[in-house]
Amino acid sequence: MIELSMHTDNWRCLSGSFQKAVEAARKFDLKYIEFGVVDGQDFIEGLGYSPAVSLDSNPIRLRRYLEANGLQASQIDAGYPITGPSGATFGVRYAQRAIQFAAAIGCPRIDTTDGQFKPEGYTDKEVMAITRQNYRQILEWAEDYQVIVNLETHGPYTTNPDTLEAMLQFFDSPWLRLNLDTGNTFIAGGSPVEFLKRFLSKLNYMHVKDVSPDLAAALRGESTGIAMSASAIGQGVNADNIKACIQLLKEARWNGLLSVECLGSDEILSASLAWLRQQLAAPTTPANKPPFMV
């Protein structure tokens, strides 16, 4: 079964709080919510102008708050860049703390990724060697806490399918999986559909993001990732790709979550969720193959 979640980051550009995102999730009849975390304290979050959650928060209280609102955490976004030396210095500890927090609130997965730019002064071979050791340390915690570590397509390494494959093969572990982002793979100049076909067996979670014509014209092939999109899902130039991806998932009998990434206004959220629910409800002919499980 394919279900819907949404990322609280949709409210960051609106200076919206975590509570604002939770209210929207209830309003639009969602059962799941994804959120980013802050390692320590952030005055923006403390003042209520950020939808992130501090890792210093009481996780049990947060879990009760979500349950009281009929919600479960689908994924914790721990997207500080894991690649290279800064990943070793800051990203590993950040991901490990996110794993602990996820386990405490009953969230089955965290999200990790590479940076927007390649580390200066390092060859790709050096970066990959460091990154492999970073994931080795993270996966030790993932295995003990039984929390999946997803690798998201976001930066120059993960939006290159050959490099992404190498990273997913760092270790033969069921705890290292893929979070495919339809918007980032498209902006990077690739095809979300081809990414999905190639990596379906590794797919654990998906960020669904459409792209406006203006944004595509300005950034496609020049950037590798966008945080969210001002375009409602189904109304941008990536809509056909998203529709094809959903069809592939349904044919493969994939079981998992699609997380909505769009501007968190009622108008855009409503249009995005209506379009996605229409795609999920559309008839399909299942392929004669066993289902992919998350």
Which residue stretches match the model-derived regions?
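The substrate-binding groove and active-site-proximal loops of carbohydrate-active enzymes
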Residues: 10, 49-53, 80-89, 231-236
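N-terminal small/glycine-rich loop or linker at the start of catalytic domains
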Residues: 1-8, 72-81, 114-118, 224
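Short, solvent-exposed loop/turn segments at secondary-structure boundaries
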Residues: 17, 46-51, 85-90, 121-126, ...
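Conserved beta-strand positions in the central sheet of alpha/beta enzyme cores
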Residues: 34, 75-77, 111, 150, ...
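Histidine-acidic metal/acid-base catalytic patches
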Residues: 1-32, 67-69, 158-294
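Active-site acidic/histidine proton-transfer and metal-coordination neighborhood
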Residues: 20-24, 59-68, 72-73, 82-178, ...
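Glycine-rich, proline-tolerant flexible connector loops at the mouths of alpha/beta enzymes
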Residues: 34-61, 115-122
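Active-site loop/turn elements of alpha/beta-hydrolase fold enzymes
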Residues: 35-40, 78, 112-115, 154, ...
